[in-house]
């Protein structure tokens, strides 16, 4: 059964089981990367957020939710993804920010999604995605691209990995 998201779904309590929601699109500002090596994902995240936060301020935009990565194809040894933040209104045009990073307007897709929360360290995300996609299929739904991760818990050096929450989301066909 599909539920309408009553508040931003990325600010809700953890989704302890696979939940189907109908959601509106959400304006975002992102750095898009194509054919980026999986081994350089942490560098992509670090460079994006080092440039993104100050750039939002200069553009008069406010973040309205946690960081995310949106994947436009299944990853292999490389990934095509957008890394960014949801914002209070769309960015008018691309902006070149710190270190020459181009930030572009985008959005988290609206429509019917499946979502579940992974509670634990990032190194458990691969298994969590496998279980999530299996549960979605077993419930009779067909995952579609894109899919995305929402990093509800902001990582920090003092963070207990067991307390971290990452929401796994896929658009449904």
Tell what function each PLM region has:
Residues 1-173:
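A solvent-exposed interaction/effector surface
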């Amino acid at each position: 059964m599909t539920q309408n998201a009553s508040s931003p779904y990325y600010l809700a309590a953890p989704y302890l089981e696979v939940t189907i929601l109908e959601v509106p699109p959400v304006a975002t500002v992102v750095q898009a990367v194509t054919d980026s090596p999986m081994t350089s994902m942490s560098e992509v995240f670090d460079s994006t957020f080092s440039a993104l936060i100050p750039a939002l301020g200069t553009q008069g935009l406010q973040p309205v939710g946690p960081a995310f990565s949106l994947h436009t194809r299944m990853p292999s040894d490389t990934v095509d993804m957008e890394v960014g933040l949801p914002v209070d209104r769309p960015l008018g045009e691309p902006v070149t920010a710190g270190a020459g990073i181009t930030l572009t307007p985008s959005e988290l897709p609206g429509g019917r999604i499946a979502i579940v929360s992974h509670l634990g360290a990032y190194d458990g995300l691969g298994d969590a995605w496998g279980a999530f996609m299996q549960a979605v299929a077993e419930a009779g739904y067909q995952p579609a691209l894109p899919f995305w991760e929402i990093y509800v818990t902001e990582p920090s050096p003092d963070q207990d990995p067991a307390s971290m929450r990452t929401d796994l989301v896929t658009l449904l066909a």
